[in-house]
Amino acid sequence: MKNSNKLIASVVTLASVMALAACQSTNDNTKVISMKGDTISVSDFYNETKNTEVSQKAMLNLVISRVFEAQYGDKVSKKEVEKAYHKTAEQYGASFSAALAQSSLTPETFKRQIRSSKLVEYAVKEAAKKELTTQEYKKAYESYTPTMAVEMITLDNEETAKSVLEELKAEGADFTAIAKEKTTTPEKKVTYKFDSGATNVPTDVVKAASSLNEGGISDVISVLDPTSYQKKFYIVKVTKKAEKKSDWQEYKKRLKAIIIAEKSKDMNFQNKVIANALDKANVKIKDKAFANILAQYANLGQKTKAASESSTTSESSKAAEENPSESEQTQTSSAEEPTETEAQTQEPAAQ
């Protein structure tokens, strides 16, 4: 992990947090800058910066952080945060301090961001567990491929990858020998085992391997490395595939992990979880400058949806009273054709 852009994209800059937090530690008239004939107060600074994109994002993150800390604060330990912090530091190596500095972060502000992320992660996983229906299990089973044994070549250059693929296609080519010679992985590792739910192998590589029969060799697979932002190129050969059992319950534990992992990556699902937490916290925006920071979560929370549905029902009832003939026509139409909900109810639920 040698590129500091990942930090920039994933955390709030220290400067933006300071722009907002300054108002908490001092009053509006506190002078933060003085000069000949003029001063700049906290209020001046706040009004100047609050409409900027970075401050809008900072406020959103601050709200989410406070809400999830209040609701799930006891679910994430200091040890977990420290572990994640040191793992990131190890991945960046010697460039970690520079990456933090470039993002205007200190170790402590970065740890706070890690904690906030983990609190949301916990809430999302807990919500995902409630989605574990028989239908979800069966759906996951349909696309599931059990453990595969593969040989994989990892390369840094597309032209080299294409050349290696041609070499592999030659009659009598020894995939294992060529793989060990050409791969750029540490210690020349080429043998792997994983199933279709693996997260330690690039998704496109997993998909390609899952689609192959035993002995099959993939084309060159191009993958953008999310840590280095550099492209990697893969060629895989499936050497063995476990036979898939007919009963999905044989894989229930594994399917559970896959379903939860997929929902945890689903931004729409994440937003619903955040929206529900915001609803529960009864968040109210007091400054119009920040009126739209929660727009992406509007109408996603359970309370918000219920209020919206209640409002719609009330408006429909009022309209029916004002237009009785139209209401009667609607009722007649509804009696002739089942609603979507009724149509679904008429069929037995999947078991």
UniProtKB/Swiss-Prot annotation:
Organism whose genome encodes this protein: Streptococcus pyogenes serotype M1
Q: Per UniProt, what is one GO molecular function of this protein? A: peptidyl-prolyl cis-trans isomerase activity
Lipid anchor (S-diacylglycerol cysteine) at which residues? 23
NCBIfam families in the record: PRK01326.1, PRK12450.1
Which residues constitute the signal peptide according to the record? Answer: 1-22
Q: Which reaction does it catalyse?
A: [protein]-peptidylproline (omega=180) = [protein]-peptidylproline (omega=0)
Tell me what this protein is called.
Foldase protein PrsA 1
- Could you tell me the membrane topology recorded for this protein? Lipid-anchor
**What family does this belong to?**
Belongs to the PrsA family.
**Location(s), subcellular:** Cell membrane
What are the start and end residues of every segment in region (Disordered)? 303-351
**Low complexity: compositionally biased ranges:** 303-317, 326-351
InterPro entries per record:
Foldase_PrsA (IPR023059), PPIase_dom_sf (IPR046357), PPIase_PpiC (IPR000297), PrsA_foldase (IPR050245), Trigger_fact/SurA_dom_sf (IPR027304)
Q: What Enzyme Commission number does this protein have? A: 5.2.1.8
- Primary place of residence? membrane
Q: Which GO terms describe its biological process?
A: protein folding
Q: Which PROSITE patterns would you find in this protein's record?
A: PPIC_PPIASE_2, PROKAR_LIPOPROTEIN
Q: Which gene encodes it?
A: prsA1
